[in-house]
Every structure is written in C-alpha cells, then in structure tokens.
Amino acid sequence: MSIIQEFKEFAIKGNMMDLAIGVIIGGAFGKIVDSLVKDIIMPLITVITGGGVDFSQKFIVLGANPNNLQSLDALQKAGINVLTYGNFLTILINFLILAWVVFLMVKLLNKLRRDKNEPEAPAATPEDIQLLREIRDELKKQA
C-alpha cells in the first residue's frame, strides 16, 4: 500500500480531524493552565510565603555585572547572562498541573469506556424458577 493511499485512509477515517481538534483544544487548554498558574497559584504561593517569593524575579547572574544591576529586566537589556530559574519553576508548575489534569481526563474516559464495554451481568434467576429447575433435576434422577 502506498503512503498516499495510507494518508487518504487516515484522513477519511476522521483521525486527522480528531488530531486537529485535539491540537486546537490542547492549545487553548494550555493557555488556561498558564493563566491558572500565573494569576492564581503563584500569587497564592507569594501570599503564603509572606510575600517574599516572586518566582518571576528569581535569577542568578552568570558572569560580570559591572554596573551592579539588580532587576532582571535591566540585566537582560544590558546583555548580561542570567539564569532565570524562577521562570523555569513557573513553567514546571504549569506542566505538572497540565499533566495532572490530562491524567484525570484519561482516567475518566477509560472508566466511561470500561463501563460501556462491560457486558451487563445476567439478572439473578427468580426463586420460583430455581425451585422448578431443582424439582426437574430431581425427577430426571429418579426416572
């Protein structure tokens, strides 16, 4: 089978549309998580830690700082090499939250699929039917 034929089958089956929709929703969801971390979680962490922690301003100056600049913006504008580990921590928190939410969504979808695919348990045999079967079996043994 040629690669073009495989691509046509892939596109016709709807997998391409599913993928496109997933990418679009994923991009929008990523923005929601970014906002959650930046606008809600990080300010709460700052308040909990007594206002002294602002991850966006956490950095280490790598190399010489001849003008003794103190702010991250000033250091970056001056072209001084800066290790911005606070930004990394914020992105790491974003990732962990996003991974957790995706995990919960997959877990929920798997549970819903499992519930759909499980065959229904057969209904319990009523007592009178069970009694009639036992009587029939006894009569067969005696005959």
UniProtKB/Swiss-Prot annotation:
It is found in: Cell inner membrane. It is a multi-pass membrane protein. InterPro entries: Mechanosensitive_channel_CS (IPR019823), MS_channel (IPR001185), MSC/AndL (IPR037673), MscL_channel (IPR036019). GO terms for molecular function: mechanosensitive monoatomic ion channel activity. Signal peptide: none annotated. HAMAP family: MscL. This is Large-conductance mechanosensitive channel. It comes from Acinetobacter baumannii (strain ATCC 17978 / DSM 105126 / CIP 53.77 / LMG 1025 / NCDC KC755 / 5377).
